[in-house]
Amino acid sequence: MIRFKKTKLIASIAMALCLFSQPVISFSKDITDKNQSIDSGISSLSYNRNEVLASNGDKIESFVPKEGKKTGNKFIVVERQKRSLTTSPVDISIIDSVNDRTYPGALQLADKAFVENRPTILMVKRKPININIDLPGLKGENSIKVDDPTYGKVSGAIDELVSKWNEKYSSTHTLPARTQYSESMVYSKSQISSALNVNAKVLENSLGVDFNAVANNEKKVMILAYKQIFYTVSADLPKNPSDLFDDSVTFNDLKQKGVSNEAPPLMVSNVAYGRTIYVKLETTSSSKDVQAAFKALIKNTDIKNSQQYKDIYENSSFTAVVLGGDAQEHNKVVTKDFDEIRKVIKDNATFSTKNPAYPISYTSVFLKDNSVAAVHNKTDYIETTSTEYSKGKINLDHSGAYVAQFEVAWDEVSYDKEGNEVLTHKTWDGNYQDKTAHYSTVIPLEANARNIRIKARECTGLAWEWWRDVISEYDVPLTNNINVSIWGTTLYPGSSITYN
């Protein structure tokens, strides 16, 4: 009887255990199925990462290659050439409006909004993530776990790591200088966005870049971008996409949030913190040497007194905008003295509690394979160069002991509506008239004079060579003063052409 009771008790316990374990096994299987659905769903997404993040800017089919215009004593030839620019940046500039969409560990969609630097955030329940900071000295203290990786909580965790470094290690460790520099002339919004990897609206709003004036050749603008990185914060990459999502999330949930072949999911893998300085060099000069003058000014502190570029610098202004660091001190500086800009760049170059870092750029990866999400920019733009010509004159002087004749001719250039060169031939009304010494005159030339031809001949009195050339020059350059002199005798004539 006792043996029977024991057997019955064991059977009851076994049955209870089976009933208890069944929900656990079922629940565990449900979680596994959800994780597998996310991993297999993201893995099965079909897309070309180069195409899904392609940015096709301006497409230029036709343009006027050349035009000329007279302004006062000047003739300005505007020459346009079609250029193409292709870039594939992996570090994307951060602007204030997207801070809460570009923090370490943030989930995004690789869609058109991402290409335009206004990423779409993928809002779902998340698993904890680890973020790491590369400040020197922290060693094993450089990482922190964020249980619910929202923008606010990740920002708080980063502040905690930075505060720890400031309190314990800033006095014994210095930050290595990591500076990125880029520059470009401005031709269009798409071109400058691709060249500097920054949203053109940022430059338009913060620096006041007048793209219409640039397009109309009323102004020439160069933009400099200085990025000084104080530290970088990275999020651990997942072994599987499902490692990022709460166990309650399914692949269907992700699809409802916008995940598709056209918009695969991304994660912000790292964010660089520091400060960015944008500098605008702007001039109303139409000289073809503007770019060379600006580059010389950037490299050489003494070049501003150079006579070579004096006219350009006198008609230039400079603007600097600082993002990050102690930006209250140098939020925006507008000046005609480039030394003031140098001071802005030099000041506050060291990270401290009084000179904090600012998120300046980020890199994202595709969840499917952790490959870097590079935006592929391709745009056409028109590169415009201006050549300025001034009026000139020909000074004829005849002091020779003989009868002389002159021939002066030139072409005046203009351009039709299609940009084709149109030449109008001009001649001096004193051509081939006998002139005896001493004779002098001035022949004015318009600023659009080209193909200048100057000829002078003397009467020898010889039956077999009645006229002999003293000067015969083609393609004489247009200058302020073209001095043409002839002298001597019929047997020994002399001549010269000088310019000033």
From Swiss-Prot:
InterPro entries: Thiol_cytolys_C, Thiol_cytolys_C_sf, Thiol_cytolysin, Thiol_cytolysin_ab_sf, Thiol_cytolysin_sf. It is found in: Secreted; Host cell membrane. Its main location: secreted. The keyword Heme does not apply. One of its GO terms (molecular function) is cholesterol binding. A motif (Cholesterol binding) lies at residues 490-491. GO terms for cellular component: extracellular region; host cell plasma membrane; membrane. The chain crosses the membrane at residues 189-202, 209-218, 287-296, 304-316. One of its GO terms (biological process) is symbiont-mediated cytolysis of host cell. It is a multi-pass membrane protein. A cholesterol-dependent toxin that causes cytolysis by forming pores in cholesterol-containing host membranes. After binding to target membranes, the protein assembles into a pre-pore complex. A major conformational change leads to insertion in the host membrane and formation of an oligomeric pore complex. Cholesterol is required for binding to host cell membranes, membrane insertion and pore formation; cholesterol binding is mediated by a Thr-Leu pair in the C-terminus. Can be reversibly inactivated by oxidation. Belongs to the cholesterol-dependent cytolysin family. Modeling based on cryo-EM shows a homooligomeric pore complex containing 38-44 subunits; when inserted in the host membrane. This is Perfringolysin O. The lineage of its organism: Bacteria, Bacillati, Bacillota, Clostridia, Eubacteriales.
